[in-house]
């Protein structure tokens, strides 16, 4: 079976309606999915038609199906996601049902041989599937759990469930009648106010699903810095429907749009260029974080058991000077957080104490947590660690507004991918690594964690950080002058980026 992940775009009807044609095409182009799923449990014909009109990949919404269409099946055929029949035997398939009411019939069809299971893994999409909580006992129950257990027993092939009523990013391994079924959410992720959200899902054949939440405001005209809903409407009224239109319009003409200042015009124009070219833009003459010698900074990342950690269970350091990577992982005793801290400091202070350390958003998380754990578990090294030069590239580029980056968000993996970084494709997120270690802490069973995969995830972050640093280091600068902006646009500042 191929290890290539299946990429699905889970797009609710509400999100589809909030995206105009240009923004919808932009979202699909950005996510580059194998298919688009509408996880709504009710028929949404207009949203379905809107999405089908905008994309060339399969669009799946079985709520509109007629007799015999209550279950649809897809698998990769010659590299493309294609509808396949019940007698096909792909290694990895996607079954989508109209509702949980269909699950018993699905199980019966598999039991009788009317439907043949996949060879290695089935991804089962169930709109309307969610979790109910008893108000008295507070016990949580997965709706249609018995039916899912029956499907899993009948198929025998490992199954991963995508639940339409649970938000993208949700994950729990449910034990259903002595059968364990991993359940992930594919509904709209937690939102940002009234802005509709949706998610790109990377489904790894081994069974895990990584969700990348997205907002409708990240696509189309609103993807550009300085453009809100009102400005987007005013630009469209002037015939500017896309970022390409903004990029090709002189700044002096953008200023003519009601409510657009020259600074905002420069901002949106420069951002359009950055997103189009994929090249970062240096906005100031500020130097990048300095080093103590001619060697580049070492890139550091930590993994914890949550945002209020009780342990730093993995520390990774990538040294671009000799392309080496060193990791420290607590695989045996999560009750002793000091062991990994001391091991890391023994190595780092002996071999790299004169090097500059670089992180992404480290001033907000990595450095404070490291300092807290050092003070508690290795106080004899606290003063030596204080002498280490530490910098935060995210602060320098984004919060201090020294650079404009091509990612749709300023998350490291998003920025690095936009800059051409090709990682290990682990299918993991920071939340999943934390959840995996929490499970290990609860059970004490190290076999519950795919250690090598989680180590690759941390190494990926370290190497991605260096890739972003090098891209910014080599990026051009844009001067802000009337002549330059009128002929090509510049960027004065990024206060609201």
Language-model features and meaning:
Residues 6-8, 248, 256-298, 302:
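Long, highly charged low-complexity segments
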Residues 103-201, 405, 411-489:
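Acidic, Mg2+-coordinating catalytic module of metal-dependent nucleases/exonucleases
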Residues 189-192, 201-211, 233:
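Long non-globular sequence segments
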Residues 297-330:
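RNase H-like nuclease fold core
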Residues 301-303, 392, 461:
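Acidic active-site catalytic centers that drive phospho-/nucleotidyl reactions
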Residues 490-497:
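Low-complexity, acidic/Ser/Thr- and charged residue-rich accessory regions of DNA metabolism proteins
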